[in-house]
């Protein structure tokens, strides 16, 4: 909803980790400044309260989405995309919002185990990859398009 803060939404990103008694000790995301300040308010996704950080997400705000997990002595992974905050449905419950990915690069399919993904997870990844190909391919030559097609294939 339009009245949501990043702190409210942060728990949604953490839920799959918390369900497995895991956590990441960094923010889920942060605002990106128009002068390219990488950590710029007023909005962000954090699980720890910071005084004065009550800014609601508004249309046009660019926010990063960067959950990750680090297993000491083993491995770590962190995905980071930039998202544009957009207005969605307006109804009797309020103005709903959604995020549009604006960082359009393929996810490394060799590092993904589709056997542990839900159908919804697969659909999200496949839809994202279809958008990556659709938007980026027209700017590439034929050889580059073939490379992109391989790395944005459906799973």
Predicted regions and their residues:
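Active-site neighborhoods and metal-handling regions in enzymes and metal-associated proteins
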Residues: 1-155
